[in-house]
Curated annotation (Swiss-Prot):
<feature type="binding site" description="in other chain">
    <location>
        <begin position="166"/>
        <end position="169"/>
    </location>
    <ligand>
        <name>dUMP</name>
    </ligand>
</feature>
<comment type="similarity">
    <text>Belongs to the thymidylate synthase family. Bacterial-type ThyA subfamily.</text>
</comment>
<comment type="pathway">
    <text>Pyrimidine metabolism; dTTP biosynthesis.</text>
</comment>
<dbReference type="InterPro" id="IPR045097">
    <property type="entry name" value="Thymidate_synth/dCMP_Mease"/>
</dbReference>
<dbReference type="GO" id="GO:0005829">
    <property type="term" value="C:cytosol"/>
</dbReference>
<keyword id="KW-0963">Cytoplasm</keyword>
<dbReference type="InterPro" id="IPR000398">
    <property type="entry name" value="Thymidylate_synthase"/>
</dbReference>
<feature type="binding site">
    <location>
        <position position="51"/>
    </location>
    <ligand>
        <name>(6R)-5,10-methylene-5,6,7,8-tetrahydrofolate</name>
    </ligand>
</feature>
<dbReference type="GO" id="GO:0004799">
    <property type="term" value="F:thymidylate synthase activity"/>
</dbReference>
<dbReference type="GO" id="GO:0006235">
    <property type="term" value="P:dTTP biosynthetic process"/>
</dbReference>
<feature type="binding site" description="in other chain">
    <location>
        <begin position="207"/>
        <end position="209"/>
    </location>
    <ligand>
        <name>dUMP</name>
    </ligand>
</feature>
<feature type="active site" description="Nucleophile">
    <location>
        <position position="146"/>
    </location>
</feature>
<comment type="subunit">
    <text>Homodimer.</text>
</comment>
<dbReference type="GO" id="GO:0006231">
    <property type="term" value="P:dTMP biosynthetic process"/>
</dbReference>
<feature type="binding site">
    <location>
        <position position="169"/>
    </location>
    <ligand>
        <name>(6R)-5,10-methylene-5,6,7,8-tetrahydrofolate</name>
    </ligand>
</feature>
<feature type="binding site" description="in other chain">
    <location>
        <position position="21"/>
    </location>
    <ligand>
        <name>dUMP</name>
    </ligand>
</feature>
<dbReference type="InterPro" id="IPR023451">
    <property type="entry name" value="Thymidate_synth/dCMP_Mease_dom"/>
</dbReference>
Amino acid sequence: MKAYLDLLSHVLNNGTDRSDRTGVGTRSVFGYQMRFNLQEGFPLLTTKKLHLRSIIYELLWFLKGDTNIAWLKEHGVSIWDEWADKDGNLGPVYGYQWRSWPSSDGRYIDQISNLLAMINHNPNSRRLIVTAWNPALIDEMALPPCHCLFQFQVANGKLSCQLYQRSADIFLGVPFNIASYALLTMMIAQVTGLKVGDFIHTLGDAHLYSNHFEQAKQQLSRTPGILPLIRINPKVTDLFSFQFEDFELLNYEAQPHIKAPVAV
């Protein structure tokens, strides 16, 4: 994951110090891109241990169209707790926009199902896009979408994905986002009969919170290891039928976790 460490180093050494919504303060750059060849391994950080369980359950939760944290908490995942209201609701966040985008004529658009249909029937389309950025509903969301738009391309029998992330917490959030969208690409490739290509991660405001500087330096002092592999149950042919048990992480040798506070 040299590409990720290069990002950390670039922001730490070349970023601009700015104030932000949380009051913590950040060092940021505007516009940055990383590329990962998914045939070379699963892009899960080895320079600090990540909680893959949370990544998988969050992705399955998005795909369910759920926007309440109850299901996540049932499975021991707490990454959305800080933003939920007393009933566990988050408003019309990712899952709602992915699966039930409300149209002006009263319909609800299932962007994920539409995406799968287009990949299967018109793989050369340049419209293989899903967006979570709905301006009409931003104010109703507990947190506006950070990873807000992704696009797929099919070429030479391979499926590639590019994510645009408007706001990127590079120490805590970005490693999760890389793994999540890489896994989503692998899942969609499997159910559409394709091989995996690249995951391209394009960042808008790429920032390191001021209380993450020392943790970033600690991580940069570590040498990355060989990427792990992830085995997906080959019997699953429906994207919405995947369960946590359908994923097996292989050969993951990571250095110890590095704690850092979440900016809310």
